[in-house]
Design a protein with these regions (language model features):
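A structural signal for beta-rich interaction modules in eukaryotic proteins
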Residues: 1-111, 115-295
């Protein structure tokens, strides 16, 4: 076995891509990676894994789905649609992250990958589906994305399984006149990259917190926050949302004097599926508000 073959079979090496945007306030970003040579490389921002055959430059970005193109094929989005640019034959395989918790046998009938070019759309049968990724063989690039088989999904809807979800927190600048601040909760599937959401909330401060939870599609959720003046809406359905806007799922209104707040996301049975004590203060010794530190 050659050295290059060994690299192609090795676990992926993580890399942090260079982020590029059209302007400082642009919500559209591209990811750039100078691949050093053959091997497996995983993007720390998107979760994508590229199995590379050669040294090259990779440039990729998430673009908006056109669901009217998918509908005739009986497919619905199950992940972001990525437009990828690189030389032909530079990539052997592409691993796209999914959010499913179902077993591998079921996923074989549920998930596939679409390849969209200027000539139209083709559906690729996965080479393999792991607990985290859908793997396809590729040779040339344009746009790739994971899709679900609509008929298969709703055939088993009476006995649903959860998907891997995440809760992202964004604190709006305080209103000094009313002495109020708004904390936004964005509830999404696990395979939506954080950076894609952050770019849609550039006027807010992202608050790191444990992200992971299990969520059921088309079921409603509520937020409990005892120190809030108001939480709105009172309940919200969870749907797979792959952008491009990523609006807040819940808004929590708080006094600016609040430094720490406990938030719980609850399901229809009033069971906590996610709970966290959120620190709304900055790193200074007096715990000044994070906006006063310019973070």
């Amino acid at each position: 076995m050659s050295e290059d073959d060994t690299k192609l079979m090795a676990p992926p090496s993580s890399f942090t891509p260079e982020l590029q945007s059209e302007s400082p306030k642009s919500a559209q970003i591209s990811y750039r990676f100078m691949c050093p040579g053959p091997g497996r490389f995983q993007c720390s921002s998107t979760g994508l894994v590229f199995v590379m055959a050669q040294k090259t430059e990779l440039v990729y970005k998430a673009i908006q789905w056109n669901e009217s193109v998918l509908q005739p094929s009986g497919k619905i989005p199950a992940g972001l649609l990525f437009k990828i640019q690189c030389p032909e034959d530079a990539v052997c395989q592409l691993h796209l992250p999914h959010c499913e918790t179902k077993d591998a046998e079921f996923l074989k009938s549920l998930l596939s990958v679409v390849h969209i070019t200027d000539d139209g759309m083709s559906i690729l049968k996965p080479l393999e589906i792991t607990d985290t990724h859908v793997i396809v063989t590729v040779s040339h690039f344009s746009a790739f994305g994971i899709v679900r088989a609509f008929e298969v999904f709703y055939r088993f809807f009476s006995n649903p399984c959860p998907v891997h979800g995440q809760v992202l927190l964004f604190l709006r600048p305080p209103n000094l006149n009313s002495q109020r601040q708004n904390l936004h909760l964005v509830v999404l599937s696990r395979n939506v990259p954080l950076e894609e959401v952050r770019r849609r909330h550039q006027d807010s401060v992202y608050i790191p917190a444990p992200l992971k939870c299990l969520l059921f599609e088309d079921q409603h959720y509520t937020v409990d926050c005892p120190t809030a003046f108001i939480v709105q809406p009172k309940k919200a359905d969870f749907d797979l949302d792959f952008g491009p806007n990523y609006h807040p799922t819940f808004e929590i209104r708080l006094s600016t004097s609040i430094k720490v707040v406990t938030i719980a996301l609850r399901d229809q049975k009033n069971t906590d599926v996610w709970k966290h004590d959120v620190d709304l203060t900055g790193p200074g010794p007096e715990g000044n508000h994070i906006f006063r530190h310019g973070l």
